[in-house]
């Protein structure tokens, strides 16, 4: 899904049409410390649950398309009082030299709690 014409956020009005039975993830990108509208993203993902075809036990447990955010340019930001890294199902942070937080290379992945997954998973 491309960006909107008046800002750098994804065009949420086109997201629903982009989800097909083959879609496994939506990957929003938080830019310049500004998180995406996760309420809109999750609303669309939930509305398309009937199309989702799981290919693994973890996808079955999630039961819908995963929301995997790129939060590298929003480290420390919040969405409605929740730190980025705890909003999407999974959030990735690159620590490349051009990112807001750098270790020259590397990165991390965070995830929010999901009652269908135990700590061992």
Residue ranges: model-predicted function:
Residues 1-4:
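Short beta->alpha connector loops at strand-helix junctions that form conserved
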Residues 6-103, 109-119:
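Active-site phosphate-binding strand-loop segment of PLP-dependent enzymes
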